[in-house]
Amino acid sequence: MSMEDPFFVVKGEVQKAVNTAQGLFQRWTELLQDPSIATREEIDWTTNELRNNLRSIEWDLEDLDETISIVEANPRKFNLDATELGIRKSFITSTRQVVREMKDQMSNSSMQALAERKNRQALLGESSSQSWSSGPDKYSRLDRELQLANSHFIEEQQAQQQLIVEQQDEQLELVSGSIGVLKNMSQRIGGELEEQAVMLDDFSHELDSTHSRLDNVMKKLAKVSHMTSDRRQWCAIIVLFVILLVVLVLFLVL
């Protein structure tokens, strides 16, 4: 384990991002609790910045999870013990809990109602600071501002949904690419197996042919051996007969 470990680089960035997000969250809470200290633009900016920071932290935590999975798959290569892995997992879990708590607070119904009330109060404050010539024009202007605020909220929700859809599309593309790679690998393996099957079939035919030829050769050798044995027997009989005749002749002569 060294200081060049990429985990610590990403960990430092995550800690900085968490500190920034906590500061934004504190400011966001203050803006909602005290309607007189900020405008609607500041509330919107703080809300968007906070959400973007939390989303970025979640992505970084996913990257850290992947690094831990890689290390667990091959612990000898990275030379990390179980204690160090436990510390890293604990950091990811605690950080993810902090992010989840802030997101839960932002999505809480009471906090959303407080945010909407703050937006309305900011609109009323901005509207009251302007000089309008008549009462009906004042309320129509306020109504337009409220509609604009609602439109802004709807656009923000649509943007979030679009971001989710894009992330899902990216994940589907990754899955599709992996499936394509596996399909190509399976096709190659299938082709190689077919080629090997053909080679084995050809080898089997050649082996059968060789075995048949070997049997024929062995039969011919057996015949030749048998013939040679018969010739030797006849030669031995003739030699013995000649010796017997010689002995008889010598006996008669002597």
Swiss-Prot record:
Topology term for the membrane: Single-pass type IV membrane protein
Region annotated Disordered, chain positions: 103-138
InterPro entries named in the record: SNARE, Syntaxin-6/10/61_N, Syntaxin/epimorphin_CS, T_SNARE_dom
Coiled-coil spans in chain: 46-72
Cytoplasmic side: 1-233
GO cellular component: cytosol; early endosome; endomembrane system; Golgi membrane; nucleoplasm; perinuclear region of cytoplasm; phagocytic vesicle; recycling endosome membrane
Keyword Ribosomal protein: no
SUPFAM superfamilies: SNARE fusion complex, t-snare proteins
Keywords for the protein's UniProt record, in alphabetical order: Coiled coil, Endosome, Golgi apparatus, Membrane, Protein transport, Transmembrane, Transmembrane helix, Transport
Residue ranges occupied by any t-SNARE coiled-coil homology domain in the UniProt entry: 162-224
Transmembrane segments: 234-254
One GO-annotated biological process of the protein: retrograde transport, endosome to Golgi
GO molecular function terms attached to this record: SNAP receptor activity; SNARE binding; syntaxin binding
Residues of the signal peptide: none
Localization: Golgi apparatus membrane; Golgi apparatus, trans-Golgi network membrane; Recycling endosome membrane
Highest taxon of the lineage: Eukaryota
Main location group: Golgi
Function: SNARE promoting movement of transport vesicles to target membranes. Targets endosomes to the trans-Golgi network, and may therefore function in retrograde trafficking. Together with SNARE STX12, promotes movement of vesicles from endosomes to the cell membrane, and may therefore function in the endocytic recycling pathway.
Family to which this protein belongs: Belongs to the syntaxin family.
UniProt cross-references to PANTHER family, sorted A to Z: GOLGI SNARE BET1-RELATED (PTHR12791)
Name this protein carries in UniProt: Syntaxin-6
Organism: Gallus gallus (Chicken)
Upper taxonomic lineage: Eukaryota, Metazoa, Chordata, Craniata, Vertebrata
